[in-house]
Amino acid sequence: MDTNFIQQEFEEAPTRPKRRRTFIIIGIVIILFTASVLFGVGRIVSAAFSAGDDIEGAVESLSTLSFAEAQENVGGAIESAKSARSGLQFIGWVGYLPWVGDYFESAEILLDSGISGGEAFYEVLTIAIEIEGVIDDAEDILADTTVDGSYTFETFPDEFKLELLQVLHNRSDELYSAATKLNLAQGELAKLSELDLSDNFYDKIGDAEEVVSDLADTFEILAPIAQSLDAFAGLEQDRQWLLLFLNNTEIRPGGGFIGVYGLLQMSEGSVEQIFVDDTYNIDQYVEDPEYFVVPPQPLVDYLGVDKWYFRDANWSPDFAQSSQDSIALLRQEFAHVGQPVPQIDGVLGLTPTVMERVLGMIGPLEVDGITFEPETFTEVLEYEVEVGYKDRGIGFEDRKKIVGTLMDTLLDELFSLPIDEWPALFGIVKSSIEDKQMGLYSTDEDTQDVFSDSGWAHEVSTDKIDDILLIADANMGALKTDYAMEREVVYKIDSDEN
């Protein structure tokens, strides 16, 4: 039987060319796959060696304070890390393999955090180079000074202090950028805890996390300070700060009873003068009937006062409001007794807890033959201003002058701190602000915005209307008992259909 056309075509169809094409396609895929792997791995290895050389060069340059060379090396390391990161894209399939995948992901995270951290460090070195220029200009004056970590801010003559502060002030944007990038690096490193990696790897990463965390904390504090340096230090014009020593052993809504206050005058980056006094010394002059300011009703009910005195000014739990009240009441009392009314540009409130932390860093201070240590600071100071002054033959009105002497001594110590100890001091400031042991207020609107954005102002927000309750404690005539009391507060909100 004859075959038809279709059968004939089917039987004669060749099969070898199809197989050959299949093998060719598979071969091309293998070649491309191998090439991509070799290219990706080669790029990663090359970049790793290059980055290692750059990092080693940066460390060596930093050891000799050659900031420009260090910055060049850091820039090279950043580019190498970016090259390695792009190399990973060619072998991305490795990330889907069991066990190996976690290490692949860790490499991505480390490179991302390294790039963020490197870019932050690059910007910091830009500032260091500018500061180095100021130091070079002062070379003749500072001939006997070595800038090696034992170097202190107090070493500089006033004109060079001012120039250094101006550099920081003008570079505040770079400091903010560095802080942001360090936080990004910190966030990337935190992702590693979710991966299944070796303990040895985690130990090494832990060290890196600690360094990045310390740097991030430093720049989170330094950046707003730099932006507000004119308000802080009087770079362009003299500034005067009202210091409120808030005794948290006698709690008030604004932080603590104001037993002592101070006026700190700053001019061109230097402390011009600091005056510290007992609040009762000014309050006693307005006890006459001619002076009257309506006090908050609880002060009348529980303390029996007939007017609002400066010592009770911080009644509001909103630190900005209590600062405004403190400024107003102090100025009114000065005016009433015929004394020059102080122009106040800002308020710094701090509790004894801040002093304890600072002493824990710099060590004990001896003032008027009395040793103040971090563990016993509050008790010793309390004893001296309530009892000990009598044994030393000091009058009642002068019993708190020791606080002024203590502040003078403390400022001398802080300005003499080696540069390499500044990050620890910034850490104390950061923790004290977060714990609300320290608060800041400025009469300048722009500066106050900086404080608010940084979380330093401790304002009571009224933006949210879903939470209308606030707990604010106040010690009303119970003396200095809060230091020994423990509190437990249960704050619970239940929602219903309405």
Regions found by a protein language model. Name each.
Residues 2-15, 22-29, 39-498:
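Non-catalytic, solvent-exposed segments at the cell envelope interface
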Residues 33-36:
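Hydrophobic secretory-pathway targeting helix
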